[in-house]
């Protein structure tokens, strides 16, 4: 199946229609992401959403508009068969995903530097989760509409791509949240071990002083909880 070369004006209208489907604000992006589930989907981003919505928009949305521009240029420069259109849409989908991944990494690296090693280690895994499924070679006849124009057909495919992207983004956010929570728990466990070590070291010093005849007195036994409490001056 080969589509005829489309007039420039038609392509401009197509690009405008595609851009209109994208969120245009931080609030709109949050609604777009959470539409496939509940508003808690992006809740773990916490103060980021309220701190600088303009930055969120710039990072997440500008890359999408740039990707649509590249797609528009490809479609305008040559006659497009269905395979080429679907391949270009697949590249567009990957570009969208890459933009989202870069935004997540930029946020956590800035707001939580301690997460940088985790992100560097897990980033490849994050991208693997985002790998798109192969684009089908044959479209389901039930989805075809008689007399459908090239632009209408591309718009229908683009809308289907956005639905897949929405579901994928929901999964990515859940995955990142899971990793962050796991890291916080690991840090808390290490901190408890450090407190226990400090208490054991204190007990060792006290025992050493006792062996030289220093009276222990009626001091209570140290515990990790006691070590973590602020000591009052006497």
UniProtKB/Swiss-Prot annotation:
A cellular component annotation (GO) from this entry: extracellular space
A matching Pfam family: IL32
Keywords from the UniProt entry: Cytokine, Secreted, Signal
Cell compartment(s), UniProt: Secreted
Region of interest (Disordered), residue spans: 213-234
Entry keyword Signal: yes
Signal peptide location: 1-30
GO molecular function, one term: cytokine activity
Tissue: Selectively expressed in lymphocytes. Expression is more prominent in immune cells than in non-immune cells.
KW Signal (keyword) present: yes
GO BP: cell adhesion; defense response; immune response; negative regulation of viral life cycle; positive regulation of gene expression; positive regulation of type III interferon production
Biased composition annotated in UniProt, kind: Polar residues: 225-234
Major localization class: secreted
Induction: Expression increased after activation of T-cells by mitogens or activation of NK cells by IL2/interleukin-2.
Function, in words: Cytokine that may play a role in innate and adaptive immune responses. It induces various cytokines such as TNFA/TNF-alpha and IL8. It activates typical cytokine signal pathways of NF-kappa-B and p38 MAPK.
The protein's name: Interleukin-32
Species annotation: Homo sapiens
């Amino acid at each position: 199946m080969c589509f005829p070369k489309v007039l420039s004006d038609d392509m401009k209208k197509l690009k405008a229609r595609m851009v209109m489907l994208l969120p245009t604000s931080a609030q709109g992006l949050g609604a777009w992401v959470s539409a496939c589930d509940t508003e808690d989907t992006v809740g773990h981003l916490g103060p980021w959403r309220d701190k600088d919505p303009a930055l969120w928009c710039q990072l997440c949305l500008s890359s999408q508009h740039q990707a649509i521009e590249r797609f528009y240029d490809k479609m305008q420069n040559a006659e497009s068969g269905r395979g080429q259109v679907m391949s270009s849409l697949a590249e567009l989908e990957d570009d969208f995903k890459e933009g989202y991944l870069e935004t997540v990494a930029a946020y956590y690296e800035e707001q939580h530097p301690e997460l940088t090693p985790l992100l560097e280690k897990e980033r490849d895994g994050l991208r693997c989760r985002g790998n798109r499924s192969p684009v089908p070679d044959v479209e389901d006849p039930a989805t075809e509409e008689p007399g459908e124009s090239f632009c209408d057909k591309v718009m229908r495919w683009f809308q289907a791509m956005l639905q897949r992207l929405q579901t994928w983004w929901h999964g990515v956010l859940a995955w990142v949240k899971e990793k962050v929570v796991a890291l916080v728990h690991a840090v808390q466990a290490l901190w408890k071990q450090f407190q226990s070590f400090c208490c054991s070291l204190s007990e060792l010093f006290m025992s050493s002083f006792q062996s030289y005849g220093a009276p222990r007195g009626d001091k209570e036994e140290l515990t990790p909880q006691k070590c973590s409490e602020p000591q009052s001056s006497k």
